[in-house]
Amino acid sequence: MAPTKATTRAAITSGHHQLQQAVNPILGALGAATRKGLTRRAAATGNIDPNVENMQTRAKRKADHSPIKNDKIKRSALGNLTNNVKIMTLHPAQDEEQSGVGKKPTAQQLQALMDAKKQENLSVNVFGASKMTTRASSKVEDSVENCHKVLDKLEEALARPKPRPKAVPAAKKTVLGEVQLPAMPNPMQIPVLLPPTHNLAAPQVAAVKPVRRISNDFNKTEDSLYMSALEDVSSCDSMRLSGNFEAARRRSAKLQQKTEQQPQPLLLTLPETAPSQVVPIPPVPEEVEDFDRKNWDDPFQVSHYAMDIFNYLKVREAEFPIADYMPRQIHLTTWMRTLLVDWMVEVQETFELNHETLYLAVKIVDLYLCREVINKEKLQLLGAAAFFIACKYDERQPPLIEDFLYICDGAYNHDELVRMERETLRVIKYDLGIPLSYRFLRRYARCAKVPMPTLTLARYILELSLMDYANISFSDSQMASAALFMALRMHGGPGQLDKQTWTSTLIYYTGYQLADFAEIVTALNAGLHRKPRATIKTIRNKYSHKIFHEVAKVPLLTNQELFQGNLDLNESNLS
């Protein structure tokens, strides 16, 4: 049927009605957006963007902070790490332009509120709140109310008087140990420094203000004031004020009460046993070269304190006595200990550890066995734990627990090694500053300018003595002196037997005469002459290498040859 004028007019009218129904929601949304722009922007700028008619509109009204449907939201790989993650976006500057509310009160805003309060005119529109009762407007009202609370607390703090610091009366006499020093002619009074109170002048409130820190404004129930270090300095720890200046006042009052008590004079007392333990440093003899003075400018030699350090280590030797513990160890034998030390030397070579680590580990084992009884199944575990502790003490990069479990061939697990480590530290009372013979030997050889092959031979003698149970009770400093004396005699050759080996230089720096450690020399020499077993050749093979100058192949001397021309064996009752 062909269209007529009537049917055409009816179709046009129906199309107009449908178009009107589709346009009306769009015009309504456009009007709402225009009114919203007036309340937020026009109130501040006084004009309207002429292109507001071209704004992108939505067919359905959404929440204020909901994103546009067709836009893509970018998020950081780590996400938002704040408390208000749901209302944070990636463009905070644009959010502030659009919202204009929820900002922290600045110094100018606080000053404006203070002036308005003084003039009883609180109608200052600081934050530009809208008339509509929305979440944003309620947020503005809460912010204004919080600012008023801050001002009230500041005024309360300004009204308090500032306490005057008390001066501590100077002591007339100072006692150091048992020596009484004369009093100073004009003793200087030292005032007690109390934490400063918040007695600030009114014009300075804008410059020194409490900072209001808001973590989540929607869930905020009470204020939190964090005083900076420049505003409130505490002598012990930082003071945190949670919206209450009364806490600061109470702390200041308590500190003031403590200082008002009768002060006691300063007494510096030393332990009664300290004077007997201090070893005086004798003057350097004329025939002895002052090694420390010669190396005074070398910071690595520590020449200023070297003599004091080694005298202190000699005093500490008495704090680590090792008695004959094998009768108490009913499950162990001296041969088991020898096998353990030989295995520890192999571990030191495998991991390329320092020699000090090996000596400290053996000391820890002996100290533990002096105080605790164990069975033979735990002996290797004790050696591994002692080595693990020594590595942590001396090594830059200690091996891992898995390395020690591997070197033990899977005999123990991770928990057993850690448990033994804790137990060992508890038994030795966590004291790892044990004087070691290796450190004494290095000091003595350096002062006497001993050549490296001779020093290596002395180290071989010392390391071989670690396996001998008969040497556990000897002094480490005397062990180092005996090993150095033997190395000097053995490397001197047959033509140097009548030469005086223990010179005045060694006597001065070691502090020992030859007769003081002659008994140790015979014990060490007996260990060198003992026929080695096939199962304990680690140390001999180690020092037979060219790196160690093959000192294990040096010919041995008898006791008589060792002391020839230096000490009379008949007078010393030595054979």
UniProtKB/Swiss-Prot annotation:
Pfam families: Cyclin_C (PF02984), Cyclin_N (PF00134). The keyword Nucleus applies. GO terms for molecular function: cyclin-dependent protein serine/threonine kinase regulator activity. The N-terminal destruction box (D-box) probably acts as a recognition signal for degradation via the ubiquitin-proteasome pathway. One of its GO terms (cellular component) is cytoplasm. This is G2/mitotic-specific cyclin-B3. One of its GO terms (biological process) is G1/S transition of mitotic cell cycle. Cyclins are positive regulatory subunits of the cyclin-dependent kinases (CDKs), and thereby play an essential role in the control of the cell cycle, notably via their destruction during cell division. Probably functions redundantly with other cyclins in regulation of cell cycle. Its presence may be required to delay a deadline for completing cytokinesis that is ordinary imposed by nuclear envelope reformation. Degradation of CycB and CycB3 promote cytokinesis furrow initiation and ingression. Required with CycB for female fertility. Ubiquitinated. Ubiquitination leads to its degradation in early anaphase. InterPro entries: Cyclin (IPR039361), Cyclin-like_dom (IPR013763), Cyclin-like_sf (IPR036915), Cyclin_A/B-like (IPR046965), Cyclin_C-dom (IPR004367), Cyclin_N (IPR006671). In embryo, it is expressed in all mitotically proliferating cells, with a high level in neuroblasts. Not expressed in old embryos and thereafter. Not expressed in endoreplicating tissues. Interacts with Cdk1 kinase. The keyword DNA-binding does not apply. The modification Phosphoserine is found at S215. Keywords: Cell cycle, Cell division, Cyclin, Mitosis, Nucleus, Phosphoprotein, Ubl conjugation. It comes from the Eukaryota. Belongs to the cyclin family. Cyclin AB subfamily. PANTHER family: CYCLINS. It comes from Drosophila melanogaster. A motif (D-box) lies at residues 75-83. It is found in: Nucleus.
